[in-house]
């Protein structure tokens, strides 16, 4: 039986807005409306959150991994010499909240790019609820994981009750008012303050002044991670060593040395699992086959099997020492062109259909993500913020030590569900 919780509503249609480290901005179709009066103080409301029967979140972890690899591969091909970091979990949450308002061909295109499992809307919301609960259940001794989702809406626009119910059920997201149409830069400041708080100050600015012109809704997801290694690296064992960058230059990087860690090879890739305290989370460092093309990515299904084998210590997994560079990565990037290239372009045009969100919603005008990832001797600190803006109308392992001395990938994953919290490509560990 589906159980209803967290009911807060106003009349038949709620006027709302929300927050998360991943934000989506949406615009409405038609001519621009007159400048509305200043909105009342911010009010946050929730729809009817349906407590769904417990389902397996792992298919959604697999979906987000496939989506994240697609995005990272496309991004790398457009910028093969730079360090790249993204949060598939955060980006999928921001876009997933938009998907819940999409209909027709727009929904089909978004589902294909997001690799969403084929299901009914009710089953989808149940799966998203299980995924969200798993993410929020990763906290433990030595590990802090904070995930939050929010919808921000201009108070002059009407958000459909059914949409509020869907985001409350799938993402535990509320809707908060912000003066997106009357004072967009003030709304930017409000959203940035919320993102900074949700990421413990790691992302002080997701959006910039002028970035929310003609945006009526912003869907945000925020994700923060601070995790200690199960076995920390000894600082005294960190030493300089050569690293050949994606540009073909040799630089001196600071290599952490430790082990043994579980390692295996599959399809020419060498994978090493570095668990965090408590065993719920792990980093998987992936060294591509020697001589592989610059932006070669592993297959999502194969990567899932590798991470599962490392977590379980399956036959073929051996102990190896590791030399892994320290890194400190930061990015803030628009994802629109990458998502368009992957097949989501209709969602950004006036042919889009977001009538499940509001009769006044037109299309996605903004997809922005900011990420930080710091890997050091004691553990990993990482954060992500995504904003989606919706516009209104108008097997041989080789040496016993595995040295990551050329461009490689890093994946921070939930060992139980396979949910990819962070995914990175290190082209030059000395660059920040």
Name each model-derived stretch:
Residues 2-8, 12-180:
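Detector for small/aliphatic-rich hydrophobic stretches
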Residues 85, 93, 150, 282-285, ...:
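Structural recognition of the beta-strand scaffold that forms the well-ordered cores
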Residues 106-111, 292-296, 331-334, 383-384, ...:
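Extracytoplasmic/secreted cell-surface and envelope-processing proteins
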Residues 110-114, 233-241, 294-305:
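Short Gly/aromatic-enriched secondary-structure transition segments
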Residues 122-123, 127-284, 289, 315-394:
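Non-catalytic, conformational "gating/processing" segments within enzyme and secreted inhibitor domains
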Residues 281, 288-316:
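Internal alpha/beta scaffold segment
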Residues 366-432:
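C-terminal soluble interaction/assembly domains
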